[in-house]
Every structure is written in C-alpha cells, then in structure tokens.
C-alpha cells in the first residue's frame, strides 16, 4: 500500500487546480501588502512602524528615545507662529522617534524691532519641566548638555520651492527615520527654512496635545493675572457708578476683543481678500463694534478689553480712537487706559508682551477675534479644548458656556451678530489655524 505522502500522490496533489489557485492567491496577497506598505497614504503608519522598531531601546521613555536628538534652526516671527513652529518641530522629532533639543525662540518680530532680534531660550517663556511632564510619552524636550558628542551630527537639509511637495517631504522624513546608518548619529540637525514653513503632516489634535503642554512661566502668568485684576477692578468701579440707578447681580462680564484694524493689517487683509476672492477677512471698526454689541445674551454693563496694536493707542483724534463708538453698557479699556502699558507690558520684549496678552484673552468670559488671525485662532483652539473637557462639544445653542468665542469678521445666525466659533478638532492639518479660514462654525467636530 502506498503511503499518503508517497512521491506519486504528492506529484498528483501539486498538479491539482486547487493547489495552483491557492499558490497564486498567496502570491497576490503578498504583492498587495508590499505595494500597500509603500503607498503615500500609509506614510504616517510606516512612521509608526519605524518608531516601534526603536521602542525596545533602553534609553527610551514611553517610546520616545532620550539618547537620540533632533536640532532645529532658531524659531522666528510672532508668538503664535513661533508656537506653531515649535509644535511642528516636536512632531517631526516624534515621527523620527527622537527628543527635540530645546530651540531658541525670538524676542521680537524681525521686521519691527531689528535691534531686538535676539534669541530667547524656550524656558524663558514656557516651563521646561512642566512641558516634559505633561507631554511624557508623546513628545520630549532636552537641553544641549544632554548631548554626549556634539561632533556626531548629521545635517538634514529641508527642501524648498514648488517642486518640494508634501509627499516628497514626508518621504524624506521616512528615509531619515528608517536609514540605520543615519539613525546611528546622536543628533540630526535640520538646516534651512524656519519650522513654521515646513510641510504639515499632523492633525489638529496632535498639535493641540503639544500646545496643552506649553505652559507659560510663572512670571508671565502673574503679569497676566495683574492685567485681568485691573480689568475686573475697572468693571467694579463702573458698577459702583450705576448701583444708585439699578442693582446688578453677580460679577460684571469681561469680554476680550482681538481688534485687528491697524494699517499694516488692513493692507495685508485687503490683499488676502483679493487673492482668495473672499470678502470676509477685513472688518472695520464700525462692523466690529456692531457685531460685538449684538452678541446674544450679553449682560450690561460689560467690560471690554481691547487687545490692539500699540499704534492704535496713540490716536489723537477722538473719532478714530478704539475707545469711542461702543453702545451703551459696553465699557472699553485697552492697555493705556488701564494703566498697564508701561507698568507691565513696557518692561518686556515683543514676544513676552504677546504672551501676556494671549493669557489675558484666554481668561476672558467671552473672546471675540478674527478667524484669519493666528493669534485669535490659537486662543479659540485652547478655549475649545477647555470646553470639550467640560463636555461641551459645540456652542451652537444659547446657554452657559464659560469658554464661548466668536469671529467678528464672519456673520452669525442673524443679521449684525458675530459667528460662534469653536475649532474643528477633526481637521487633518493645521492649515485653517496657520493661515485662517472663513469656514468656521460653532461645532468642534
């Protein structure tokens, strides 16, 4: 009797149609998986696999290696672009499974204060240890003294120009992350353009995680507290004048308005409107005043803090002042009228002044800004995060919402009111926040 695995039976089995089909099907599956793994749509997934390869590194903390580093150029421009650039550098380091070496920020806008364009360490603006504690396992920050061998550096030059597409940029990052001979270098140093101008490969939620870890140093927080206290005190003084006429229960609301009407902004936004073929970027002083005054449910009296450019504080003519023209019950103040322009803001560089103003606007009961302003957009993003933590996923309905925000440059649900504004946390990139959008809504998803 022949064995079931005899040569004759085995040859007959190989010749069977079923076997051939199974073999062909297996080959097809193999090549499909191979092609799928190299498609651009799975580049970020590949990045995750690359990171996973390094997870067993003994110098790794929760998956992010602490013995391999990424170095980036000095970060420049305004506070808000610098925050975005820093977050983008962190996420780039995360993709390469490296710790970001603490970059230098810039103390001022280079085109406004050329003599003050000096580097300022990240930890003079944001808390270093707190950042690493809050972002542990997601991204990491290290000091240059953590580098053992400064001579062991590999330079990565960022591409530029129209031909340097998002896909090419992502392929470059994947290549450097997966190339073992390059990965052996202790430091990969990125050269070329500012991180704000790098291609964006990350979602709004990824950026939001980094922003949440960026807590300002105590000195900036205390100065913001002082400004807010001055605003509250000004409101109480106005209440005292009105109490003889009417009894007003509870604290007077504090509304922060990021009012962009200075000359250089108006020139920029007009050009932007022409290029984008839209008419909802620029807002006149009259339009801002009308829409803020028509906010639904706004109690009076209400204190307004006007976050404006310093050039607007020097207006001599009364009709051009940002303080005149508001409807009854709205009590406007700006830095100069509050008495904090020199006492508090004047002590610091442009960057620190912006950080203080950011914190003041963040703490307002209501915030009103321009959806094409990065400053406004980042404040709304942070207020959206705070609202979501309270279970508030939208601000579409009237009611108590501690973190409600509005865009005064966009029409709301009825004539003459601003649009309710929450950041859409489902966006796959930071495009709308970095460069502005007129497609904002009262929903965070």
Where are these regions (language model features)?
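A donor-sugar binding/catalytic signature common to diverse glycosyltransferases
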Residues: 87, 354-400
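Secretory-pathway glycan-assembly enzymes, especially type II membrane glycosyltransferases
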Residues: 22-28, 43-282, 295-298, 307
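N-terminal signal-anchor transmembrane helix specifying type II single-pass membrane topology
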Residues: 2-54
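Well-ordered, non-membrane alpha-helical segments in soluble/globular domains
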Residues: 275-292, 318-323
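Donor nucleotide-activated moiety binding/catalytic core segment of transferases
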Residues: 8-12, 328-363
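Catalytic donor nucleotide-activated moiety binding site of glycosyltransferases and closely related
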Residues: 293, 299-347
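Leloir-type glycosyltransferase catalytic cores
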Residues: 17, 134, 394-445
């Amino acid at each position: 009797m022949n064995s079931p695995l005899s040569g004759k039976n085995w040859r007959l089995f190989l010749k069977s149609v079923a076997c051939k089909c199974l073999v062909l099907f297996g080959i097809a599956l193999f090549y499909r998986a191979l092609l799928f793994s190299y498609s651009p749509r799975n580049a970020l997934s590949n990045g995750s696999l690359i990171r996973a390869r390094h997870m067993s590194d003994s110098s790794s903390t929760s998956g992010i290696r602490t013995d391999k580093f990424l170095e980036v150029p000095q970060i420049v421009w305004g506070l808000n672009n610098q925050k975005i650039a820093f977050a983008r550098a962190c996420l780039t380091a995360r993709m390469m499974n490296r710790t970001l070496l603490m970059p230098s920020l810039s103390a001022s806008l280079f085109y406004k204060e050329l003599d003050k364009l000096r580097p300022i360490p990240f930890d003079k603006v944001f808390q270093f240890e707190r950042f690493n504690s809050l972002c542990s396992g997601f991204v990491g920050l290290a000091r240059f003294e953590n580098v053992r061998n400064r001579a062991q550096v590999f330079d990565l030059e960022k591409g530029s120009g129209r031909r340097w597409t998002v896909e090419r940029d992502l392929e470059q990052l994947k290549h450097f992350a997966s190339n073992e001979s390059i990965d052996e270098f202790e430091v990969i140093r990125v050269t070329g353009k500012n991180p704000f101008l790098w291609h964006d490969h990350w979602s709004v939620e990824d950026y939001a995680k980094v922003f949440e870890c960026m807590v300002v140093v105590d000195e900036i927080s205390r100065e913001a507290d002082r400004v807010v206290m001055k605003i509250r005190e000004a409101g109480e003084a106005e209440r005292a004048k009105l109490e003889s006429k009417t009894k007003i229960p509870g604290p007077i609301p504090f509304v922060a308005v990021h009012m962009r009407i200075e000359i250089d902004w108006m020139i920029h936004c007009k050009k932007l409107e022409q290029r984008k073929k839209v008419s909802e970027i620029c807002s006149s002083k009259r339009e801002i005043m009308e829409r803020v005054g028509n906010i639904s449910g706004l109690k009076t009296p209400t204190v307004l803090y006007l976050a404006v450019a310093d050039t607007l504080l020097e207006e001599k003519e009364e009709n051009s002042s940002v303080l005149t023209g508001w409807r009854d019950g709205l009590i406007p103040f700006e830095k100069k009228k509050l008495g904090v322009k020199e006492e508090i803001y004047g002590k610091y560089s442009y960057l620190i002044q912006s950080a203080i103003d950011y914190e003041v606007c963040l703490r307002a009961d209501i915030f009103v800004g321009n959806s094409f302003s990065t400053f406004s957009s980042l404040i709304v993003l942070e207020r959206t995060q705070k609202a979501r933590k309270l279970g508030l996923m939208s601000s579409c309905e009237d009611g108590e919402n501690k973190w409600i925000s509005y865009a005064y440059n966009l029409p709301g649900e009825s004539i003459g009111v601003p649009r309710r504004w929450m950041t859409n946390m489902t966006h796959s990139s930071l495009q709308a926040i970095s460069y502005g959008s007129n497609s904002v809504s009262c929903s965070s998803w």
